[in-house]
């Protein structure tokens, strides 16, 4: 049973130091007991210390405040809100932010080094092993059962977005409220979490974030000379202001929170706009999709591996168009090296891991990160069932004919995986992930904005731009009729163009207003297309007939 402090409190502070769970907080002369931390001193004392020591009998059994909470009006002025366009926001995306995101999302599966004073350390080599980046976390007061929640990485990315809006983040700070966090994470529409539970989670996650220490030893890189950043906070908590509301008995109830955070010293070298122009520092930023934050908050419990991949791919896709990712690499990110090694030795664990991995890939596909399987190393026989079922037509009659044809071929579509599927998966690759539109929108705007970069650097940046989806590609030719129409499009041309654009047969059929079986028959050469269909295909695939195969 939890307790609360009534208006009879005389302010003797006898209860504050004696509370074993540190649930009692004093702010501006107001006393408040966190009901989620107060446990009646169970396991510490035979009776609650606040009750036994209080001379005025102020502590009373906790009762939730009835009615709606009043709107908090006396807040500290917060920083400008994020995601004003409703889709994305620029955020600091340097290697410090990336590795800290990995540290938070993969905490329970990383090979961490234990240090004295109950600390764990994560170290990453940089600059061809000439430098290092070290993250350290003190575990005092953090439960061992679930020390770090993957959702903490979402707040880390929100902090990085706030930091990107500061001119000199190592000298400035940003202010935000619990209501803003709820809107970013999609909690403003959820009814399954009480207000007190949300506030307690925010307090826990932000406390964990501000405990992380980062130290950097960076070698020379281009015009930027080597530098060292001594151990300091990744994010420094300057202030956390609690907003209370009193009930009829004079007991305080927490109804809101406001934080002031200052980015660490690392931003002087990785988020320094002026220093970047002078060749003395880096200024690295990218686009943070709002949908990513809300997807993590929705799927973290049942698909934690998929959410780890989602957070990792947010940074990985910035490194080039053709990032051929092996299945073992993705599994290490999603489940950790230890579980992967266990699967090598245990048949049942292999089966469970493959099922989990294919389910997590499906979650990413539904989100909009569509994997493109390498046809040589990742053939359809070992692809997930959901990927193979995309070939099934939506029309009932066509679907019936499709299944009849598949049955005549031995039921290849739904057949069990081949013998030795695990070994084949360990050699399989995913060529790339096609991105949803909100992942690419900011990149397109950045490419169009004027910069001071040299031509060669701009060309390198263009080569490493993220992969766009169909909606982000340039429009079709202004007048497709100008293309020569003397030679009919070949099925191989259509299939190659469709695969190059990352479009499935079903998507192409929807664009053309045709059935999926019609597209399949055209690509297989069983149907000849009319001039009208040919022009519509050119529009859909932006295909130049002058580049057809001979």
Describe each PLM feature range.
Residues 356, 507, 518, 528, ...:
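Residues in the helix-turn-helix
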Residues 65-489, 500, 506-507:
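Charged, alpha-helix-forming regions
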Residues 9, 14, 492-511, 536:
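Short basic helix-loop element that most often maps to the first helix and adjoining turn
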Residues 37, 346, 513-528:
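Recognition helix of helix-turn-helix/homeodomain-like DNA-binding domains
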Residues 57, 532-547:
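DNA major-groove recognition helix of helix-turn-helix/homeodomain DNA-binding modules
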Residues 24, 494, 508-509, 519-522:
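Conserved hydrophobic/aromatic packing and binding residues within compact polymer-binding modules
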Residues 1-11, 22-46, 58:
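Ferredoxin-like iron-sulfur electron-transfer modules
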